């Protein structure tokens, strides 16, 4: 969705002296200098979406979701950041044999997108074990509420219903 809508979501934070918006590509930026003085990093950046991750799109997803995360973990370690909170996805679960799943169930992603998010989770674990970078991965499902993505199901369904349009379903 549009960068203008994303910026509008930051409206409350942009006026704070405790918030600095840095727009940069994690694969290219000087991350160590950007992280100086930080004690916690909330890694929310990623290439989202399942459908476009197939075929030719996979290299872009690998680059944005795996390589960028590895670079951020390296910078976190080098800058002495205490903790990294990683935004993962429910897509890592894939097709499970039982529901609800439990922490000990082996993830089985069913899309290249899910594979990249799980690979980045494993990188977080490796940096925690080998370098002492405290990490936690949050496996988001469809996020609903204020500032939700306008291109996701909840928003599309309710917008269509309120406007009297048919609800489009996939799958």
Indicate where each model-derived feature is located.
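N-terminal Rossmann-like NAD(P)+-binding domain of SDR-like oxidoreductases, especially those catalyzing
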Residues: 1-141
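NAD(P)-dependent short-chain dehydrogenase/reductase
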Residues: 99, 122-171
């Amino acid at each position: 969705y549009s960068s203008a809508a994303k910026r509008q979501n930051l409206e409350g934070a942009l006026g704070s002296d405790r918030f600095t918006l840095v727009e940069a590509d994690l694969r290219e930026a000087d991350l160590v200098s950007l992280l100086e003085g930080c004690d916690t990093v909330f890694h929310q950046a990623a290439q989202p979406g399942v459908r476009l991750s197939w075929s030719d799109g996979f290299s872009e997803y690998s680059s944005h979701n795996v390589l960028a995360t590895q670079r951020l973990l390296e910078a976190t370690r080098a800058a002495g950041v205490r903790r990294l909170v990683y935004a993962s996805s429910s897509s890592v679960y894939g097709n499970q044999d039982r529901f609800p799943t439990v922490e000990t169930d082996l993830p089985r992603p069913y899309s290249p997108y899910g594979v990249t998010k799980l690979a980045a989770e494993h990188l977080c674990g490796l940096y925690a074990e080998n370098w002492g970078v405290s990490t936690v991965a949050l496996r988001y499902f469809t996020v609903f509420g204020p500032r939700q993505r306008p291109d996701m199901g909840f928003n599309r369904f309710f917008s269509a219903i309120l406007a009297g349009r048919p609800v489009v379903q996939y799958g």
